[in-house]
């Protein structure tokens, strides 16, 4: 396998008729180590890597990670996600593979449904698939720890917790200085947080003005500061940040404890409302013994979700 320090091409911009550049035209050096290319979300090394590995391998692993590749054009643009339709749930499932040591568990919204008496009406049957070896997974986490310490996710780093992950930004077709989609995905050994920011349809009236390193990262940090205190707080014991391994110190300002407490207060309010929703849901499900009542229960759920 490749070393996390492997130097990748950061200069080739033309592959036949396909032209590519780094976001905002950034090009620091002709080559960059792989850990830096990933942490800084550089386009040129990603496309160069896809070109070296071959599109068959790229598509094979896209499918292994649960992505629908059937209608995606077989071009190098796929290295940047072009043509791949996905959502936060699918991406949480994919990145959960790294958090689980290379094993992907199928994502689901409901683990089980109980009635008001506590009886289980329906439960989810977990399916697990090994996608990567443990050693490969460790290398990926080594590099993705750098996203939050030195890369495009420094503004998303939560207080008191170490996360690994990736950011992503798509340019609009009508203005390269504007963006249509912004992703921030982070994980610990306990949890994956997958966030997308954008509009259902991007056009000249609906767009974002910065990259995922800006507003999207600030939102992610608030969410992470709220969620992580309720996890086990498991550390990445078997891996080390690739930047630290190369003697490079973290950059950016660390989130303060005050910020974390404010975010946690917001989450407590959400948690209380969610608990009330669960109690109401149990009652609605227990009473939904005929089609008409079942429909009322479903309408109640849709109302909570804002549909």
Predicted regions and their residues:
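Conserved catalytic neighborhood of penicillin-recognizing serine enzymes
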Residues: 2-58, 119-146
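Structural recognition of the beta-strand scaffold that forms the well-ordered cores
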Residues: 6-9, 36, 46-49, 61, ...
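A penicillin-recognizing enzyme superfamily signal
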Residues: 3-4, 86-250
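Amphipathic alpha-helical membrane/lipid-surface binding segments
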Residues: 263-301
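Mid-domain, small-residue-enriched loop/turn segments at the edges of structured enzyme/sensor domains
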Residues: 19-26, 54-93
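Sec/Tat-exported extracytoplasmic proteins
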Residues: 1, 12, 38-42, 49-53, ...
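Stable alpha-helical elements in mature extracytoplasmic
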Residues: 30-34, 42-49, 54, 58-61, ...
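Periplasmic/cell-envelope proteins involved in peptidoglycan metabolism and beta-lactam response
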Residues: 62, 299, 303-307
